[in-house]
Amino acid sequence: MADSSPAPSLRAGGPREPRPSAPSPPPPHSRLGSEAEEAELSLSLARTKTRSYGSTASVRAPLGAGVIERHVEHRVRAGDTLQGIALKYGVSMEQIKRANKLFTNDCIFLKKTLNIPVISEKPLLFNGLNSVDSPENETVDSFSHEEELVAAGEDVSPLSPQELDVQPMQPEEVSARDFLQRLDLQIKLSTQAAKKLKGESRDEEGLYTASLYHS
């Protein structure tokens, strides 16, 4: 009879090493997340607009603490230039263009007044609804008033040094003179009252002494 024993499953030379498995593909949800991030990044880059020459897009840098931007009204006159106005108020021509929506430098003559964005370091004080005028606003208003007088042909005569020295001293001199006069009057009244009281006391002592003598 033939041998019916099963053939050995292992060959001579020992067991066979397992083959390395191929890397598994990434799960679908991770690929979807990365694609969504890339799409969002591309949209954010597309929203960022580059500024071209003559653009009136209002792109403002964040102001620091205690720095504010206010607008000063400037009347356009014959002979004004955008560069001269910018140098006068200490701002750039692009800031004036953005504030007034101007496309070229010659467009300033299309407007009667221009809004000049002036940056100040002192914050404005508010009393509910209306703002309190700061000393800087008063300086700008007085300067514009003098310009209007000069443009109208009126001479603005500056004050002489003697007038500047005399004017603020007048209220102080009057108040000091009044104070000294009042002080002298009080001293006189006090002296008279003291003399009167002293005389009355002497009369009373004399009457008392006379009454004792007669008694």
Swiss-Prot record:
Phylogenetic placement of the source organism: Eukaryota, Metazoa, Chordata, Craniata, Vertebrata
Entry keyword set: Acetylation, Phosphoprotein
Biased composition (Pro residues): 20-29
Gene: LYSMD2
Keyword Acetylation listed: yes
Disordered: region residues: 1-40, 194-215
The organism's place on the tree of life at top rank: Eukaryota
N-acetylalanine modifications at: 2
CDD domains to which the protein is assigned, alphabetical: LysM (cd00118)
Pfam families named in the record: LysM
Record-given protein name: LysM and putative peptidoglycan-binding domain-containing protein 2
Residue(s) carrying Phosphoserine: 5, 24, 34, 58
PANTHER family assigned to the protein according to its UniProt record, in alphabetical order: AND PUTATIVE PEPTIDOGLYCAN-BINDING DOMAIN-CONTAINING PROTEIN 2-RELATED, LYSM AND PUTATIVE PEPTIDOGLYCAN-BINDING DOMAIN-CONTAINING PROTEIN
SUPFAM superfamilies: LysM domain
Gene3D superfamilies linked: LysM domain (3.10.350.10)
InterPro entries reported for this sequence: LYSM1-4, LysM_dom, LysM_dom_sf
Domain annotation LysM: ranges: 72-116
